[in-house]
């Protein structure tokens, strides 16, 4: 069949897609803080990088700030899922805020490893994107001794003060393949470097990228639901494009362009780890309106991981125990 003669037929859904355990936990922390203490609740940085999620929480009474000086004395403050530096933690405590830490436990694992190895005299090479809040939080665990590399070329430029005790850590939301390539370059220059006991890139990032690798060759176009600030969503689009599939990232269904689907039969659809399923369903509805007949979910890994909530948020304002489950935003369908 001529490409021009192709008509929209089928939507293939990546599995898994959308919310991960760390995002679900972070959103639920804000929701429960609002339930227990009432609005406003202050959140340093966007709780997760998704426009819809942030706007929904704003409507419930969350106020998102970057500077702690914008938070009134005695207020309740939540740290975002990306983590914060030691300096931010210390300042928040000094200002007397009631603090709930929504840092993803997998990011916290990296922070703990950095602190442990630093005491043993290690310097660090961090693979990540300059300016990303997770990178700033991890590098801010120490006053010095962490060298950021964004690509292979950066590996040749860094100048650790010693190489006998050197360890690698990575941003959790990177491209798995890119991180492996940079890690190999680090190992080639510093053969004795200590690599992570377990890969820092999180299970959800790995699973969503693996799903795109399976999905991309089977479709004519791939749509990623995610906000521009979402690192892991951007990596999904880049991965599909690298595999030779036309790929676009949209914040929501309103950003879809009819021209993208001309001459296309099969549409692949996935979502970054901070994008709620309601946005995926809206995109499906829009693509159906353009002519797609069926929707099929691909086989994939079922994620069952749940991260515990802070103890102070397992009860409501009256001291009644709250059920631990998915956030309200996760339940939206």
Curated annotation (Swiss-Prot):
CDD domains reported for this sequence: lytB_ispH
This protein's record includes keyword Glycosyltransferase: no
GO terms under biological process: dimethylallyl diphosphate biosynthetic process; isopentenyl diphosphate biosynthetic process, methylerythritol 4-phosphate pathway; terpenoid biosynthetic process
GO molecular function, one term: 4-hydroxy-3-methylbut-2-enyl diphosphate reductase activity
The record's free-text note on cofactor binding: Binds 1 [4Fe-4S] cluster per subunit.
Sites where the protein binds [4Fe-4S] cluster: 20, 104, 202
Residue sites binding isopentenyl diphosphate per the record: 49, 82, 132, 230-232, 274
Pathway given in the UniProt record: Isoprenoid biosynthesis; dimethylallyl diphosphate biosynthesis; dimethylallyl diphosphate from (2E)-4-hydroxy-3-methylbutenyl diphosphate: step 1/1; Isoprenoid biosynthesis; isopentenyl diphosphate biosynthesis via DXP pathway; isopentenyl diphosphate from 1-deoxy-D-xylulose 5-phosphate: step 6/6
EC number: 1.17.7.4
Amino acids binding dimethylallyl diphosphate: 49, 82, 132, 230-232, 274
Major enzyme class: oxidoreductase
Residues binding (2E)-4-hydroxy-3-methylbut-2-enyl diphosphate: 49, 82, 132, 172, 230-232, 274
Family: Belongs to the IspH family.
Protein's recorded name: 4-hydroxy-3-methylbut-2-enyl diphosphate reductase
């Amino acid at each position: 069949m001529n490409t021009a003669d192709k008509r929209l037929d089928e939507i293939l859904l990546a599995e898994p897609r959308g919310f991960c355990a760390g995002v679900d936990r972070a959103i639920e922390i804000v929701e429960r803080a609002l339930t227990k203490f009432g609005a406003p609740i202050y959140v340093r940085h966007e709780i997760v990088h998704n426009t819809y999620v942030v706007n929904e929480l704003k409507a419930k009474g969350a106020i998102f700030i970057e500077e702690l000086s914008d938070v009134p004395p005695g207020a309740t403050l939540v740290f975002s899922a990306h983590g914060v530096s030691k300096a931010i933690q210390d300042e928040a405590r000094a200002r007397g805020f009631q603090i709930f830490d929504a840092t993803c436990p997998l990011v916290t694992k990296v922070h703990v490893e950095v602190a442990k190895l630093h005491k043993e005299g290690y310097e660090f090479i961090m693979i990540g994107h300059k300016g990303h809040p997770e990178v700033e939080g991890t590098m801010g665990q120490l006053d010095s001794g962490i060298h950021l590399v964004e690509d292979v070329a950066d590996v040749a430029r860094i100048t650790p003060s010693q190489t006998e005790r050197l360890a690698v850590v990575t941003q959790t939301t990177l491209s798995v393949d890119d991180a492996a390539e940079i890690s190999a370059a680090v190992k080639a220059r510093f053969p004795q470097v200590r690599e992570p006991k377990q890969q820092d890139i999180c299970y959800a990032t790995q699973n969503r990228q693996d799903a795109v690798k399976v999905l991309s060759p089977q479709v004519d176009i791939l749509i990623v639901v995610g906000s521009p600030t979402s690192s892991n969503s951007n990596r999904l689009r880049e991965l599909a494009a690298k595999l030779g599939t036309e790929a676009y990232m949209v914040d929501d269904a309103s950003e879809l362009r009819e021209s993208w689907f001309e001459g296309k039969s099969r549409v692949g659809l996935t979502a970054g780890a901070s994008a709620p399923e309601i946005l995926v369903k809206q995109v499906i509805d829009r693509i159906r309106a353009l002519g797609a007949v069926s929707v099929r979910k691909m086989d994939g890994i079922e994620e069952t991981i749940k991260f515990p909530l802070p103890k102070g948020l397992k009860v409501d304002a009256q001291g009644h125990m709250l059920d631990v489950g998915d956030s309200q935003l996760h339940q939206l369908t």
